[in-house]
Amino acid sequence: MTATAARAGTNPVEQAVIWLNDPLNWTNPGGILDRLGEHLSMSAAAVLLGCLVAWPIGLWLGHSGRGGGLVLLISNVTLAIPTLALLTILPLTFLGFGRPAVVVALAVFAVPPLLANAYTGVRQADPEARDAARGMGLSGGQLLRRVELPLAVPYLAAGFRTAAVQVVATAALASFVNGGGLGQIIRAGFGLDIAAGGGQIIAGGVLVAGLALLVEGVLALVERAVTPRPLRRARGRANRRAAAAVTGN
């Protein structure tokens, strides 16, 4: 927080606006642009690692028709592990403090939606399409690659969207283990007294929330683009029925 922002007013919201409008806070080394690049790079690496782990397992279990309980167990166990606890424990291993430990911890957090949606996507494939493919002599691997996987793409996109938004929002905790990212701005604000650092804390929170919403919006468009129109209509009807059930209408 600059001295100018601190003098401009005691309202932390006003201080946050001034801080965000200071060009030096964007362009200086360790400024917003640098932290944004760190945040995006480690989030992308974590989601990619989660995909490499979760998608093959989910697709194969969905193809085999077994392991639904295992998918549920893995999802529940990984969701039950606090990300902050992982960020605290992993740096004490061979990964050390810094980016690798952060990426692994965030990847664990990304696994549940990726795994569950991969499994569900394959299981929801049209049984008639499966039977027709088997009738054409396709092997199990060919059936998965040529029939089930293309039909599962909308579900994979939905899982990717959920995982990416969760990881981007949670990556702010990386600053606690010297991982960088936008959370470093918030942490630096807490290092100042509240009168001087309150605006910087709010500004950092706004940046993290804004980035998460931007990722959500972009990936929502991608998910819509890869989802066939009939499936979009079916999901819309299901969502309306669920909303009606909740409201009692």
Language-model segments: which ranges?
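Transmembrane alpha-helical segments of polytopic membrane transport and secretion proteins
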Residues: 1-19, 30, 217-249
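Periplasmic/extracellular loop-to-transmembrane helix junction in inner-membrane transport proteins
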Residues: 2-47, 194
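Loop-to-helix entry region at the N-terminal start of transmembrane alpha-helices
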Residues: 31-42, 91-113, 153, 200-204
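Transmembrane alpha-helices
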Residues: 44, 140-174, 203
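Cytoplasmic-entry segments and transmembrane alpha-helices of multi-pass inner-membrane transporters
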Residues: 57-90, 106, 116-120
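Membrane-spanning helices that line or support transport/gating and their immediate boundary helices
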Residues: 59, 117, 121-124, 128-131, ...
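Short cytoplasmic-facing helical segments at TM-TM junctions of multi-pass membrane proteins
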Residues: 117-157
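Hydrophobic alpha-helical transmembrane segments of polytopic membrane proteins
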Residues: 182-223
